[in-house]
A protein has these predicted regions:
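Aspartic protease
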Residues: 1-4, 10-104
Length: 104
């Protein structure tokens, strides 16, 4: 399932499609897309191994970067981590933490 979302950074605004995945234990954003939006990219102290949904190793191999994003659902907002990696055609994957925080 997908959902339309809107990105607002200091430099750019964009409308995109995110993949909804309750099985994903974290939120993810495409690294190239985060760079295009000029988001503040932070480096993880301890990179983590990264696997695709089908269990194969991701092309990026390890999660090295993340960004903090303010997520709005109606009038409620919360700040969530988004790990940054190569997501191929997807701009973002909203996982369990997003659902738990926003309870859409």
């Amino acid at each position: 399932m997908t959902i339309r979302f809107y990105d607002h950074s200091i430099v750019k605004q964009a409308k995109s499609i995110a993949l909804l995945d309750l099985g994903a234990m974290d939120n993810f954003m495409n690294l190239a897309y985060a760079k295009w939006l000029c988001l503040l990219i932070k480096q993880l102290e301890n990179p983590r191994p990264l696997y695709n949904i089908d269990g194969t190793e991701n092309k990026s191999r390890r999660l090295k970067y993340y960004t903090d994003l303010e997520v709005w659902t109606g009038t409620v907002n919360t700040t969530l981590w988004f790990f940054l990696s190569d997501l191929r055609e997807h701009k973002a994957i909203l996982g369990y933490p997003c659902f738990a925080a926003t309870q859409p």
